[in-house]
Regions:
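Loop/turn elements at helix/coil->beta-strand transitions in domains of secreted/extracellular proteins
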Residues: 54, 233-236, 283-288, 307-309, ...
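Conserved radical SAM core fold
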Residues: 207, 245-247, 314-333, 365-367
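Structured mid-domain segments that build the active-site/substrate or prosthetic-cofactor binding neighborhood
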Residues: 213-219, 227, 332-443, 449
């Protein structure tokens, strides 16, 4: 099918009369996007018009499609893109990718130049494997159009309906503090809080949970959840989940319930089921979410979730050097009340048998040491395939959430994860090759060799990789750093005449420089102020704002200069670094 030739379009881009008059509609948005990119590709002046009977590209929303579903069809000399409210947008970007466009990062797109643009006949209909797909890499959280191009549909930030909106949580996680405010009840009702270490944890600290067998708490949580949902009618998931600590209630009633259920999660499920049942008539479209996290990770053997309760299974205490189903390390297995232990794959399999709405909270970075090379490249696809195999419905890939990203090839990891969340069986090697060759140019072979060396060493040595480790891993030894630096020397030389790609290589090299400075300078006490100052100067030049999850780089810089290894030791509560950018 001919779309354009010699700067002349073969037809127009058509939307319905309703969408033509509404510049905030999804169909109008993607129609103008297609017009923009086709003009860049062909220099042909395509027009967006209201439907008529001429040949062209027809774009339409269809309520019978799932929100993220789309179809593309060529028929009788025209091309038809149809989809749900996000699907119609995804379908438009899919057409552009078929033509040869690639959306690698918010500021790196590959747009071909074609004088005679023809496409083969298309007859495809797609919807994602996972209904919920999210990551908190900065390029996705702060550039909403790019997130849409990546087909991410779960957002921390507001996404305008023009971009299809998003699936949002009213409370995202660790929500006990909002549902039963500690400061409000700690003095008058200490019995509401967890019994641990011989006392109720109603003191001002970070060690409290709720006593979920206390009958008074259901009414309090229902009241506060109702207020939150009424104030946020667009948010369709509310998390009722424990705080981020392992100090669950050890009172007699809670321990008895935990033992009967085979896991503390059973006690949590009974509580949340009760809340969800009460609120369902008023909020029939809302899903109530729990975290299967740390002590609640093992599945319950007795009480199961209601139809309007979702489980988010967290892959914490999990090795990310090997696929979930291939790792032999049980050193960080979770202990059950009866003394039995399970690793993540055990829990995933059990949850998949008893829960019909299972999400996974996955991890992709070393959170205390964001810049450290994280050799998880070869587990990204098999882990998502394992999730799909076990009927997981949604995935959140927690990452380096700094607004401007990080230095450990975060751009590549974001791109690959988004492709895999849409289709875990995609040709990930082809996507990686395309990205590396375009984003890094002639430096790509050297950088690809570096990434493969990291993974080769981890696999051959059966090394285990965790998200909170601060110890220096064997694959970052002094001897190997020499080899890695040699590869980066070659990479820089290969793009010495290409300022943009040279800058990207130098940014990636900051990861190796961090390893050298952190272990050879900071932890050893052998401070080289000039070396440290230059490192932070280069971090700022690349707009890097965080070296760990909890502190910005200025606080980390001060900590290092004061002989402290991490900025968290000077910490004040962290926040996102800037507002979202469309």
């Amino acid at each position: 099918m001919l779309l354009a030739e010699n700067r002349a379009p073969f037809g127009s881009i058509y939307v319905s009369e309703k969408d033509f008059e509404n510049s905030d509609s999804q169909a109008w948005f993607i129609a103008t996007q297609i017009r923009y990119y086709l003009a860049r590709i062909t220099t042909a002046p395509f027009e967006v018009k209201a439907n008529d009977d001429g040949n062209g590209i027809y774009i339409s929303f269809d309520k019978d499609y799932a929100d993220d579903e789309f179809s593309i069809n060529t028929e009788n000399g025209s091309l038809y893109i149809t989809g749900g409210k996000r699907g119609v947008i995804y379908g438009g970007y899919e057409l552009l990718e078929i033509i040869g466009c690639r959306f690698f990062t918010p500021d790196c797109e590959k747009i071909p130049t074609i004088t005679k643009l023809e496409i083969d006949d298309i007859n495809k209909r797609e919807k994602p494997i996972f209904e919920f797909r999210d990551t908190d890499y900065g390029s996705v959280t702060h550039y909403l159009k790019f997130a849409t191009q990546c087909r991410v549909n779960g957002r921390w930030n507001d996404v305008p309906e023009m971009l299809g909106g998003s699936i949002r949580y009213a409370l995202g996680a660790h929500s006990f503090a909002w549902l039963v405010p500690h400061h409000e009840y700690r003095d008058t009702h200490p019995e509401y809080f967890s019994f641990y270490n011989g006392r109720r944890q109603n003191v001002e600290n970070d060690h409290w949970q709720l006593c979920l067998t206390n009958p008074d708490l259901v009414d309090i949580v229902v009241k506060n959840a109702r207020e939150i949902l009424k104030a946020n009618p667009d948010k369709k998931i509310l998390s009722i989940s424990q705080n981020d600590n392992p100090y669950n209630c050890q009172c007699e009633n809670c321990l008895k319930s935990d033992a009967e259920e085979g896991s503390p999660v059973g006690t949590l499920i009974k509580f949340v089921n009760h809340v969800a049942e009460i609120l369902e008539p008023e909020f029939p479209d809302v899903m109530f979410d729990i975290l299967a996290y740390h002590y609640t990770r093992p599945a319950s053997r007795k009480t199961q979730t209601r139809h309007n309760v979702c489980v988010r299974l967290c892959a914490s205490s999990t090795c990310f050097a090997h696929p979930y189903d291939k790792c032999d390390d049980r050193s960080r297995a979770v202990k059950h009340p009866n003394g039995k232990t399970t690793v993540f794959i055990d829990d995933l399999i059990e949850w998949s048998k008893v829960c019909n709405r299972l999400y996974v909270w996955d991890y992709t970075s070393n959170f205390p040491l964001y810049p450290m090379p994280f050799a998880n490249w070869r587990v990204l696809q098999p882990n998502l395939q394992t999730m799909a195999k076990h009927n997981v419905k949604g995935v959140f890939e927690e990452a380096n959430c700094a607004a401007n990203g990080g230095v450990d090839f975060n751009e590549l990891r974001t791109y690959l994860l988004c492709k895999l969340m849409w289709n875990p069986d995609c040709d990930i090697d082809a996507y990686r090759k395309e990205f590396m060759e375009y984003y890094y140019g002639e430096a790509a072979p050297h950088l690809d060799k570096y990434l493969n060396m990291l993974c080769d060493f981890v696999e051959k040595g059966n090394y285990h990789l965790y998200i909170q480790d601060i110890k220096r891993p064997d694959y970052l030894s002094e001897e190997l750093l020499i080899t890695y630096n040699d590869l980066f020397d070659k990479a820089e030389k290969a793009v010495a005449g290409d300022g943009i790609r040279l800058s990207r290589v130098q940014k990636a090299r900051l990861s190796i420089r961090f390893v050298d400075i952190f272990w050879n300078e900071i932890l050893s006490g052998n401070y080289n102020a000039q070396k440290i100052n230059q490192f932070f100067t280069d971090l700022r030049a690349h707009n890097i704002s965080r070296l760990d999850e909890w502190s910005n780089i200025e606080r980390t810089y001060r900590a290092w200069m004061e002989g402290k290894e991490r900025g968290v030791y000077l910490s004040t509560p962290w926040r996102y670094d800037r507002e979202s950018i469309l």
